[in-house]
A protein has these predicted regions:
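Electropositive polyanion-binding surfaces
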Residues: 1-244, 251-258, 263
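Internal insertion modules embedded within essential enzymes
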Residues: 259-282
Length: 282
């Protein structure tokens, strides 16, 4: 209970600096497997509160470490940044889901830098990734730098473990690895959601998909499936077409589908009724 009160207070403080806290309103459903059978699950209120509490404490720790590195290493280190204050300033009246859609449409993304910059989505002037050294390289680098700062108090001749050039290289590697892992994660989510939809259609006639279109290159039409029936989800999907002449915006459209096919190398053909609906009703 005390932890929840503290995390709520931290969220209020962040809310004075960023509209990014509205993303806490977004609670997406996800596939879970029971005895090998997938179904779609939505966290209950208690689970949502616990996850938000953990997230707030992680943000506090990451921002504290980011500031500590900046102050003790003359602004150098490895920082998680997202300079988007100007874009975000036009989105104050949006809901959490609407904000998420705008972030996707505008390509707002965080990156890693070896020089400190603000992270406007979390509302912090300094921010690092520190809390997960088991799974992220950037967090390991932060731990090495913190250890160096601690040890040099007793040894002024101690050499910093990474040069400025090495920190820059590591930042770029972290950025590349992070993007690569997200691609893998998106494919994994897509596979599991398609598997879940297939399983749902074994016991019912249809399901309703809600989607919006994010971009069109002249060949590849990219969209986000944001709802399966009443479940909020986030699933990217790409269709190949040279004849699309519809609008590119985050206006939601819906379609009922009665079948899905196994995910292949490309998305095309997995949800044929969705593809036909989009191309025939641009």
């Amino acid at each position: 209970y005390i932890g929840l009160k503290i995390s709520n207070a931290l969220q209020v403080l962040r809310g004075e600096k960023t509209i990014g806290i509205k993303l806490n309103e977004v609670s997406q459903s996800y596939p879970v497997y029971v005895d090998g059978i997938p179904y779609i699950y939505k966290n209950d209120n208690y689970e949502i509160q616990m996850k938000q509490m953990i997230a707030e404490f992680a943000i506090l720790a990451n921002s504290f470490v980011g500031e500590y590195l900046k102050l003790n290493l003359d602004g150098k280190g490895i920082f998680r940044t997202c300079e988007a204050k100007e874009l975000l300033s036009n989105m104050y009246n949006l809901s959490g889901n609407e904000l998420l859609n705008e972030i996707i449409m505008n390509g707002i993304q965080a990156e890693y830098l070896s020089q400190n910059r603000s992270h406007d989505l979390v509302g912090m002037p300094e921010y690092s990734h520190f809390t997960s050294p088991i799974r992220r390289l950037s967090d390991c680098v932060c731990h090495y730098l913190l250890k160096y700062i601690y040890l040099r108090k007793n040894d002024n001749n101690l050499i910093i473990p990474f040069s400025n050039d090495e920190l820059n290289i590591l930042s770029n590697r972290c950025l590349y690895a992070g993007k690569n892992m997200k691609k893998i994660q998106y494919k994994d989510i897509k596979f599991r959601l398609i598997h879940t939809m297939f399983n749902m259609l074994l016991t019912r006639e249809d399901i309703t998909l809600t989607y919006f279109i994010t971009s069109y290159s002249g060949l590849f039409l990219n969209l986000i499936i944001c709802k399966i029936d009443d479940h909020d989800v986030h699933m990217s999907y790409t269709i190949r077409s040279r004849k699309f002449n519809g609008e590119i915006n985050n206006h939601h459209k819906s379609v009922k589908i009665t079948k899905v096919k196994c995910l292949q190398t490309y998305d095309e053909g997995c949800i044929p009724e969705l593809e036909r609906h989009i191309l025939e009703n641009p």
